[in-house]
Amino acid sequence: MIRAIVTDIEGTTSDIRFVHNVLFPYARERLAAFVTAQQYAEPVKSILDNLRDEIAAPHATIGELVDALFTFMDEDRKSTALKALQGIIWQDGYVNGDFTGQLYPDVLPALEKWKAQGIDLYVYSSGSVAAQKLLFGYSDEGDITHLFSGYFDTRVGAKRDVQSYQNIAAQIGVSPSQILFLSDIHEELDAAEQAGFRTLQLIRGDDDGASHHHQVHQFDEINPEQIPS
């Protein structure tokens, strides 16, 4: 029996183009000026200190830190410091109405149905927890954060590491075999499966021929009571 569902965001609940064509450019355009202006104020000061640790450069100047952040963006590196700064910048965009969090139309009805069935819902994304809450708090469908029991980001571990899913199961307090993980990336599903999770792969485009996970194209194809082994 599935007692908890953990879902990815990018390519799963939300179109990858929203993240890459709207969110990422918005943050990139504002990052240098924002970091420079806020470098001595919290929480940016602490985030930059963490970034210095991340790049092993304890005396890095603000210019060097900005350069590192742009390199991380170019590489699409899952840097916790970068994700935290992006989340802060995106907050202004959401609050100002510059954009709303995009959801596939099949997502909300399924989440509401599963919640009504007594299944706890969680999010696990490489984006910061703050950014996750913003996307669902300012979504196309309004604020749907009440549907989720918790959020996880790279602080729990990388998404392709087995230990990350073991950590999530421990924090949720549910046996891995009773947790369903939804993602569009089969390497993430591989790690979750090795941790004992049940898995389903969301295919929003072409089928993934390299994956052995059961594939669905929409959330309304998912029945938590009938998850293929």
UniProtKB/Swiss-Prot annotation:
UniProt entry tagged with the keyword Magnesium: yes
GO terms for MF: 2,3-diketo-5-methylthiopentyl-1-phosphate enolase activity; 2-hydroxy-3-keto-5-methylthiopentenyl-1-phosphate phosphatase activity; acireductone synthase activity; magnesium ion binding
Known pathway: Amino-acid biosynthesis; L-methionine biosynthesis via salvage pathway; L-methionine from S-methyl-5-thio-alpha-D-ribose 1-phosphate: step 3/6; Amino-acid biosynthesis; L-methionine biosynthesis via salvage pathway; L-methionine from S-methyl-5-thio-alpha-D-ribose 1-phosphate: step 4/6
Names of required cofactors: Mg(2+)
Keyword Metal-binding applies: yes
E.C. numbers: 3.1.3.77
Superkingdom of origin: Bacteria
Role description: Bifunctional enzyme that catalyzes the enolization of 2,3-diketo-5-methylthiopentyl-1-phosphate (DK-MTP-1-P) into the intermediate 2-hydroxy-3-keto-5-methylthiopentenyl-1-phosphate (HK-MTPenyl-1-P), which is then dephosphorylated to form the acireductone 1,2-dihydroxy-3-keto-5-methylthiopentene (DHK-MTPene).
Subunit structure, as described in the record: Monomer.
Similarity-based family: Belongs to the HAD-like hydrolase superfamily. MasA/MtnC family.
Full protein name: Enolase-phosphatase E1
Organism encoding this protein: Enterobacter sp. (strain 638)
Taxonomic placement: Bacteria, Pseudomonadati, Pseudomonadota, Gammaproteobacteria, Enterobacterales
